[in-house]
């Protein structure tokens, strides 16, 4: 299953607030379609599937990509669910979004793909790059790159920057001081249900 490229608000109406996907307010807070307003009791499978879909759409991943992250999280020591969230949050595209350098993760992905972003002085065009403590994210020293990020910083997607990140607006840079804590993950979901979903497949 490839990455979703359809209407973002439609997905938000179905899954709830997905801060990384869209900044648009949900005018009708119920699922799309003629049966969207009818209350239904979902099955256990449907609940696990919905949590998995929240994760996939918020971070803009294909099914194959998310499955790879789950497998990687299981190999590391600690809570698989929390490690999974840390791996996704430390992606370069998400880190740019959380710094406020882009209003959404898709917008951050465009910055990376178009070569506007540097890490420790070198252009990095891989959205899935895993940011590490001690690294410095800067904007390419080109006027068009600076103007674009400055316009995004004026209206950030989220109000608060996580404690592991440090933004310097004056020189358009962000320092990574550690790994994100669970409490700073903006997406509301139960990550254990995502792990359960894949363990039952």
From Swiss-Prot:
Coiled coil: none annotated. It holds the Pfam family Ribosomal_S4. It is found in: Plastid, Chloroplast. Residues 13-43 are annotated as: Disordered. The gene is rps4. PROSITE patterns: RIBOSOMAL_S4 (PS00632), S4 (PS50889). This is Small ribosomal subunit protein uS4c. GO terms for biological process: ribosomal small subunit biogenesis; translation.
């Amino acid at each position: 299953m490839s990455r979703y490229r359809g209407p973002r608000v439609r997905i938000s109406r179905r899954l709830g607030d997905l801060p990384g996907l869209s900044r648009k307010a949900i005018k009708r807070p119920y699922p799309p379609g003629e049966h969207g307003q009818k209350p239904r009791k979902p099955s256990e499978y449907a609940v696990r599937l919905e949590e998995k879909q929240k994760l996939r759409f918020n971070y803009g991943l294909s099914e194959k990509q998310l499955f790879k992250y789950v497998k990687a999280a299981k190999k590391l020591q600690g809570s698989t669910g929390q490690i999974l969230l840390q791996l996704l949050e430390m992606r370069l595209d998400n880190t740019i979004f959380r710094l406020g350098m882009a209003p959404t993760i898709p917008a951050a992905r465009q910055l990376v793909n178009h070569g506007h972003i540097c890490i420790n002085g070198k252009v990095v065009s891989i959205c899935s790059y895993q940011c590490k403590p001690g690294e410095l994210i800067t904007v390419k020293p080109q006027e068009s790159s600076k103007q674009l990020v400055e316009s995004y910083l004026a209206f950030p997607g989220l109000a608060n920057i996580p404690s592991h990140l440090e933004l310097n607006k004056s020189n358009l840079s962000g320092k990574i001081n550690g790994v994100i804590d669970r409490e700073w993950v903006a997406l509301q979901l139960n990550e254990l249900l995502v792990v359960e979903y894949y363990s039952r497949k």
